């Protein structure tokens, strides 16, 4: 094979990563050799993951929340996960947000999740 495989499952779930998380949505995404899977925007999502991958994790996907967008202060946790193979190596990444609004501002309207 001439390329390192990149194929992941992306999910959004209700709950905190320290407890039970109920999966609300999950998609598959393959980025090599060509973008595909069940993800609705595979090309954009692959580009976003490639740009957000650093130091063995995907923390680069997290932006500073938009200071002009106010989110309610209620705690209704949402957890995003990424599991699979990225550039030929097994990977697993997750992040919990205090609520869906905070998730939206921190992921900055990205395509991956």
Curated annotation (Swiss-Prot):
Disulfide bonds: 31-46, 71-101
Subcellular location: Secreted
Gene Ontology MF: a single term: serine-type endopeptidase inhibitor activity
Keywords: Disulfide bond, Protease inhibitor, Secreted, Serine protease inhibitor
Predominant cellular place of this UniProt entry's protein: secreted
GO CC annotation terms, alphabetical: extracellular region
One Pfam family recorded for the sequence: SSI
Signal peptide stretch: none
Site keyed Reactive bond: positions: 73-74
Lineage: superkingdom: Bacteria
Oligomeric form and interacting partners: Homodimer.
Cited function: Inhibitor of subtilisin BPN'.
Protein family: Belongs to the protease inhibitor I16 (SSI) family.
Name of protein: Subtilisin inhibitor-like protein 15
Organism name: Streptomyces bikiniensis
Organism classification: Bacteria, Bacillati, Actinomycetota, Actinomycetes, Kitasatosporales
């Amino acid at each position: 094979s001439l390329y390192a495989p990149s194929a992941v499952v992306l999910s959004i779930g209700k709950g905190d990563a320290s407890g039970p998380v109920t999966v609300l949505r999950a998609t598959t995404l393959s980025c090599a050799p060509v973008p595909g899977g069940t993800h609705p925007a595979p090309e954009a999502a692959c580009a976003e993951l490639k740009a957000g991958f650093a130091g063995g994790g995907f923390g680069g996907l997290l932006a500073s929340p938009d200071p002009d967008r106010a989110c309610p202060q209620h705690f209704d946790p949402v957890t995003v996960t990424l599991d699979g193979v990225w550039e030929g190596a097994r990977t697993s990444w997750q992040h919990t947000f205090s609520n869906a609004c905070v998730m939206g501002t921190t992921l900055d309207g990205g395509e991956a999740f």
